Amino acid sequence: MLGGKNISEGYVGLTMDAYNKYDNIDFYNIIKKDNPKTVILYGMKKTIKATDLNLLSYIENKDNFIVKKIKRGNIIISSATRNFKNEMNSIKKIYKFMKNNMEEYTTIKPMFNYNNIDIYALSYKKNYFIFQEKCFNTLENIKFTQDEFDKMIKDIYGSLELLQKNRFLHNDLKADNIIHCNNKYKIIDWDKSYHLNNIFKSLFVRGNFLFNHPYKFYNKGIPLFFYDFLNFIFIKLDYKKIKWMLKLKSYKMMKGKITESVNSLIHDPPKNINKYYDNFSFALLIIFLAEKNNLDFPKDFVNNLLKPFRIII
């Protein structure tokens, strides 16, 4: 009997192969076991309710795809339904300005076409699945050369420029949310992203504590002492994923600079800082990954990313 394993698991999603003939833990076998009679298929502009669909025939041999099963989530009260809606709504919004370039900047990709509609996701009985291009290597798992590191910076900054041009914030930029895929570095996991014009979503604090500036949380009413407590909890929970970072000299250096920065921002509040939070996260990634891989990084470029936060390295 075949063994099997899931590819990765985060707070919101569990990733698995769409189809793997050598593994019995994949999307194909889940559908085979559950045998749903009715499924909801999600296109970018249309949702289809399909009954008695021979779904296995659409999944079989799709070994160039992975599937993200949306979970309830941890720590923060949530639900799989809400998390799925958040991610699909964000995906549809970025599709509006990326359109045919979406696969260049993201791993989001339709697995099949049904009734002339490209299908990007599927659900049944509160089970939710989003389809993605099959790629595995996230930044913390890559041994960079200088040329490859420079390419990563260029690729991701190009994505951030496009998001900022369209007033969109990914809001959860970190090492395991950037992936190397077909000679391109792409941002993944869009469930926390939002349009800066969305007043409702901008009222809530979301995103990773370690790669977000404390002022973001303070500005939403979270006292710094409580931020420090939550940060401590998340470090404990994510320790296996982030221990590579906690040992870095640059991590300790940036902790001091960030403390000075948040005190300055509280004393003299900045205007329109929200649109720069992804830049701050990206600057930290560049600094930490450079030390981890013993590489140089473009100091002037990073200082420019950090400028709105009054940080100079």
Whereabouts are the PLM-identified features?
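ATP-binding glycine-rich loop module of kinase domains
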Residues: 13-15, 28-29, 36-106
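Conserved structural core of kinase catalytic domains
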Residues: 102-149
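Catalytic-loop of the protein kinase fold
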Residues: 165-180
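C-lobe/activation-segment region of protein kinase-like
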Residues: 186, 190-297, 304
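Conserved N-terminal boundary motif of the eukaryotic protein kinase catalytic domain
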Residues: 19-31
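Conserved hydrophobic alpha-helix
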Residues: 159-163
